[in-house]
Amino acid sequence: MADEEKREMKPQEAEAMAAAPKEAVEKVSDEEFASIMGDAFADFSKLANLLPSFKTADGDLVRGVEWLDPKKDFQRKDFLSKPDFAKQRKLLVHRLKIWMDFLSRSGSLDDIRKNLNEEAAKLETNLEKNMRKVHKASREMETTYRAVDKFFANAQQEPDEKVNAYFANISAEELTNPNDKEKFENLTKAIAELYREWSIKECFAMCVVPGYLGSVENIDTFGRQLGFPNKVHILTDLPNFEKFEEVMDMLEDPSYANLMGIDNYKQYVSVFANYLMARNANQYEDEDMWTPPSAAVAGKMYQGDTIVGMQQPMAGFKYGKISDAKYLRFKANQPDASKINEKGVNPLVSFEGTAVAMGAATLFSKETFNVYSIRRTYDYVYKTMRNYLNKQTFTVIDQKFIDAMRKDIDKFMKAITGGDNILQDYNVVIFADDEMRRRQEIDVKVSLNPKYPARTFNIEFVAWNQDNQTNVKDK
């Protein structure tokens, strides 16, 4: 019975202890505070000089004890009561606690000064260590956001202009993970679904994957499974090389011999080299930050479609100047850029102090569709005509219908041909014989004569004296 009473008494004792009154804390009124901190205490200005306000390296102001000056009643009350100063009050309390801690220890002023310096050094070392970890952990994300910023800087003519762009929150490494293809399949499905609608006005034209996809096989996968079936142009990059020689070492490696090729899906891939500086390294980083060039060039292409037309590659000094880009990772002169371009890769170069895209190549090695502007022009015409023809299905096939189609298509083709338009010339043939009509089919054959960009100028000088003719040919 006694043991049971003891067990029953324990929770009651705990409750009694919990209910014990807290130690009373004496509150100091404003008048008493002023008298304590006034002449009876000491000269407040001397104390204020010991703990003044200061600015951090980031420009943030840390308030000092001068904001508690009893002679400045209005300022002191604002500082102690307004929510705007909550963060500053917390910082000041922390500073005062540090001073109180060190002053309460026994020892001379020299000992206090020494201990403060040692503690400050430890905190500085710990801060630097943690900040390096923070910047290292967030570097990839920051690079992505700065690449997105480069895209908008080149896509927009005005800061508030609407840009039709969609973003997938997924990295290139995740998209190319051989052990988890679900993310790549989901992205491909999202793009394919819009292209398979009856109306394809909202389908995608470009897919930008900033950074290196890891291998020729991965680049081909994007072109074969995403670009070619959906008529979407893929823009991506080589790795972030520091030197031109590193680029060529990679491109001349036997494992990259198949980067260019005659497979049709290679018409839908453009690769870029020479990264853009995003910002200089800060005190917690060892290297500057660089962004992949494909994002900036994609923005330039988006803007170019509206301003000059997709027939014009966003390349060269006149049309390929990259906005918000001053420094490039490495220098590439004319021979260097030509060597990179011969491998199907488009380098960025510094031209009169401006970053310029100096190439409009695809990975297709044959003529015509080895230029992205021509491939995109063909795709635009195809998508527009397909969208129109989808609206004509199940109309009775007779001469009136064929003539009406021919008139509509001819009107569209004339509107995009000649002058500053996207085509040089075209030819359209619409045909349906009796056998085809029984199968409910109509042939629409379109031949396009696109506009080709100038890449090389052959300069030939001939001496005026025909008897002693001198030829100088430079390519």
Stretches with model-predicted labels:
Residues 3, 377-381, 385, 405, ...:
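Generic hydrophobic secondary-structure signal
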